Amino acid sequence: DAWVRPVVAFTQLGHVGWMVSLSVAVLALLLWRRDWLHAAAWVVATAGVGLWIRAIKTSVGRPRPVGGWVPEGGFSFPSGHSAGTFVLYLMLAWLLLPYLRPAWRWCVGLAALAVALGVGASRVVLRVHYASDVLAGWLLGLAWMALVICAVEWAQTRVAGRRC
């Protein structure tokens, strides 16, 4: 089927190899800029969500749907592509926000959200995940990312408070 190829190409934005490569590049840039707090947050966010995914998949052990359009191994719940892309692309957008003009902030944020939601949807379309796997992945990604961002905001407030 002709529609499968573009959907498979799009879902690769959530492939672990691509996400690790992008994560390393972003980390290298943050370290080069000597932005230690955001570098630490980036590692905790991206590596942490991977650890959560692995732990939950192993604990739940839900088999994948039968008859997927592409071969996929491992357990199904939660969707690692969904959780990983949510954290990766939205954290990247959050890191970019201070450097963008206000009009571009919405564009970048919405583009990141569109990629995360699109990758998750592609997993259901390709029949390698149930919708509940994807929803759980998105919620896991959102919760983990929110926790990391709150920790960074708290740390920045504490540091700013000491300077006064």
Which residues fall in each region the model found?
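Hydrophobic alpha-helical bundle signature of multipass membrane enzymes
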Residues: 1-75, 91-98, 102, 110
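Membrane-embedded catalytic cores of phosphoryl/pyrophosphoryl-handling enzymes
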Residues: 65-164
